UniProtKB/Swiss-Prot annotation:
PANTHER family: ALCOHOL DEHYDROGENASE, ALCOHOL DEHYDROGENASE CLASS-3. Its EC number is 1.1.1.1, 1.1.1.-, 1.1.1.284. It is an enzyme of class 1 (oxidoreductase). This is Alcohol dehydrogenase class-3.
Amino acid sequence: MSAEVIKCKAAVAWEAGKPVSIEEVEVAPPKAHEVRIKIIATAVCHTDAYTLSGADPEGSFPVILGHEGAGIVESVGEGVTKLKAGDTVIPLYIPQCGECKFCLNPQTNLCQKIRTTQGKGLMPDGTSRFTCKGKTILHYMGTSTFSEYTVVADISVAKIDPLAPLDKVCLLGCGVSTGYGAAVNTAKVEPGSTCAIFGLGGVGLAVIMGCKVAGASRIIGVDINKDKFAKAKEFGASECINPQDFSKPIQEVLIEMTDGGVDYSFECIGNVKVMRAALEACHKGWGVSVVVGVAASGEEIATRPFQLVTGRTWKGTAFGGWKSVESIPKLVSEYMSKKIKVDEFVTHSLSFDQINEAFELMHAGKSIRTVVKL
């Protein structure tokens, strides 16, 4: 246990719409049932950019963003029994307390134990562990991985194989796990099935990987950026199509291509019009469409009820349906045994001082995932 305040570098988002700023921050020691982690590597995700843009209704400033990280436990607070200094870990934005009604229900991974305070950018006791220039800095998604040291609740930490390369497995903290789980947990893709994936960014590629692992026989990638097609095929897409190449709605194109529609579709963008197209591209009688992308606040989805009456199912998923603390170590093991890909998602690697470039690469569509080494 450490009672010392640590001074370190962090990328602070002082206000919406402005680049993050590398600052010296003070990180208080962990309180009861908290863990202080030295972050070794973190990736930059669209969700971080969404909050930084000011569009996130839960977004508050100043804040230390980041939720796709990995590191080493530096110290633990009182009452922490399952973790110790030196453990290799991934911080989790969806915790797993193991006690709430959500954790006790096998149908969901949405632990609610600390949801209220986490949504306000605070630790479970309602306070922050970060200060900078005399000001309180908020936490983000219970993780705040854009800091050399962070403090998280002990129920928001997965202990992983110490041999795992942290600049790769940090991606299992969000995007790769989300897409992979959408296919294998939420949709439960069956061998021999036909799948369509809308949006071929990091999450969409992870869905393709999940469909491939599950044994799908035909995997169709859909994106308006044809530069993404080659990578999608590397991950297992059998073909890719660009909606802009057709004069008719993309759902009609897919229905014609697949003799009535796909068995499973996945929307990995966060666009409500595409969510509708993904549902309507599903086969009558049994097609399942999974919403993976996060739409902007206030958006609503629409379709004709007849689409559902005639046997299509609309589902949603968060973090791929994985119960986090117990599942992430298993996903790391699957990666270490080469059952799933992770390295192939990393297109760029930058130093901490270059973190704003990671956002620029993402906005320009030039990266899948950029890993920042701290």
